[in-house]
Structure formats: structure tokens, C-alpha cells
Amino acid sequence: MTSKVGVIGLGIMGGAMARNLLADGIEVAGYDPAPAATAEFRDSGGTLASSPFEVGRAADLVLISVASSAALQEVVTGGEGLDGAGRPGLVVIEASTLPLIDKEVARAALAERGAAMIDCPISGTGAQAVARDLVFLASGDADSVAAARPLLERLGRSVKEVGPFGAGSKVKYVANLLVSIYNVATAEAMVLAVRAGLDPAMVFDVLYDSAATSRIFQLRAPFMVEGVYEPATAKISMFVKDLDVIGSFANSLSCPTPLLAAIRPIY
């Protein structure tokens, strides 16, 4: 694996991954416009870059984790964008959950300079990022995925190669559709248990390995049992953004998603 890695977007997910790399003794060049995010990264030993361009100049592997399509566009093709540092051998790992068309635009801009981008969304929460319990949904040309794999294996428990560029995002949409439904189902079930006078800890213990369990139940129900929800593992605004991306994608395929429509107002 390359001796220096770039991370653009140092929020809940990107920041956790960058700190894990630093803990492994890997040099990390990072960029984020938010002062709070950059301060924590710098305090952890990271090298703070002044622009995405500077990150691209410093590293042959660059991971992007941003909150919006506008942010991705600014990072890649903005005034001091990553495309300016594009060159053969640069592999960009786009790990955000965004509309696929926007990732395609970013990939094309980098390809003009000879750089490669893989579409590699993440299945997991901020807490799972800290614990290296992430699943990476890697899609793109085989050589670029192979170049990224050693880095991804450091940061998660599994790297799934799911097909050509864009397949990763499609799998992520399917995954987050299920997660969004499981979140609401878990909360609804635990409220029913409490209203019924049951001990929520007992209910969690009984259901944990029953037919009713799910990975989301195992992750979320303990918060409900304890009544403690801090520190936050994600932002509601980010999750709502993901739901809207999924809904738009499903609509483009004329695919009905009645459960998504039912739970969307709850978020």
C-alpha cells in the first residue's frame, strides 16, 4: 500500500477512517472546510492540506467522504479541485452516498487527466467506522479496486467487489432502504414492549438471536434500552438525504417502494 493516503471530508465517517490510518502509522493528508473537523484531524497527527488539489498532489490513493453532490463537484472540479492533480496512477475512492449521475461526472473529469475513480460506498455507522466494522461496496475497474483494497481492508471488516462503476451505489441504495425500515421497525417494537410493561433489557436479550433479530436491531436497540443516544453515530440530515437519493433512484426505475414512502415522514 502507498505510504501516504489522502482523505477529503473529515466528518463522522471520513474523520474516523483518517484517525484509524494515523493510528496505524500511515501518513494522511486531509482536507475539510469545517474547522472543527480539521482541528481533530490535526491533533491526531494528520497533515492538513489547504485544498483537494494539494491532497491529490500528496497521495496516490485519495478517499472522498462528503455530504452532498455540490461538495463532490467542488472537491473534484472546483477552483483548487482534485482534477488538477489528476494523473495516471492516482486512484480516487468515492465513498459517499450520492446520486450516481454526479459520481459519473466526477469520474469523467478525473479520467480526462488519467486518474481513476472507483465507486465505493460504505455500509456502516460512525461508531462502526471507529471500530473498523465497515463493509465497503467497491465497484469499478478491477485494477483500481485492487489498488484500493489494502487500504479498505485496514478500515473495515469486509470489501465486497460488486461489479462495474456504479454497482456499489446501487447496492448501497438497496442496503439503506432496508436499514431505514429496520430502524423504524426496531423503535416501534421497543416502544410496544415498554408500553406492555416488559423490561426492555429482557426483550433485547430474548430477541437478539431470535427470528426477529437484525443487524440494525442489534446495533440500535441497546440505545433504546439504556435511553442514551450520545455520542451520535450519524446525522439525521444525512440519513434523510440518503432516503431522498434512494427514492429518486427507485422512481427513475418505476420501482414501487411503499415501505420507504411510509417511513420517510418519520425521519
Provide a role label for each language-model segment.
Residues 1-64, 126:
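NAD(P)+-binding Rossmann beta1-loop-alpha1 motif at the extreme N-terminus of oxidoreductases
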Residues 5, 10, 98-176:
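Rossmann-fold dinucleotide-binding core
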Residues 28, 48, 117-118, 159, ...:
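Hydrophobic beta-strand scaffold residues
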Residues 52-117:
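Rossmann-fold NAD(P) dinucleotide-binding segment
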Residues 167-267:
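Helical "substrate-binding/catalytic lid" subdomain
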